[in-house]
């Protein structure tokens, strides 16, 4: 993309290298905590989209509130984080949820509202946090 800045390219390369390193170093890691990392980050995203104020220019501002309540996403998040802790002593999905939360908190404060871009930013960083914690915790 000709509109992509140099720092965005550098960040993308660093993200890809960190993910590559994390996945390469987790040969003996249990698979269920790895599979629950995206579940935890997506449940966190659902909670954020349903509960945080959207930016005026975001597609979320036109979204009707309703559908699945926030507690459904919260219950899914709690299960996705608790199950690996109890069964494998793995904090990877919890790290993904915390990473997502911190990234969204930062983006929400910077842009004064929630948007799909902020949610995507949080998903990428949250899943990176989960993968790194899984790789380090083996």
What are the functions of these language-model segments?
Residues 1-28, 33-34, 71-84, 124-130, ...:
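Multi-pass membrane catalytic core of lipid/isoprenoid biosynthesis enzymes
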Residues 71-89, 93-104:
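Hydrophobic core of alpha-helical transmembrane segments in multi-pass integral membrane proteins
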Residues 1, 61-66, 120, 124:
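Short amphipathic alpha-helical coupling elements at transmembrane boundaries
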Residues 34-38, 62, 92-97, 122-123:
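Alpha-helical transmembrane segments of multi-pass membrane proteins, especially transporters
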Residues 105-129:
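Interfacial loop-to-transmembrane junctions
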Residues 36-51, 97-107:
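Transmembrane alpha-helical segments that form the membrane-embedded catalytic/substrate-channel core
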Residues 43-77, 110-114:
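Solvent-exposed interhelical
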Residues 24-25, 50, 109, 135:
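Transmembrane helix-loop junction
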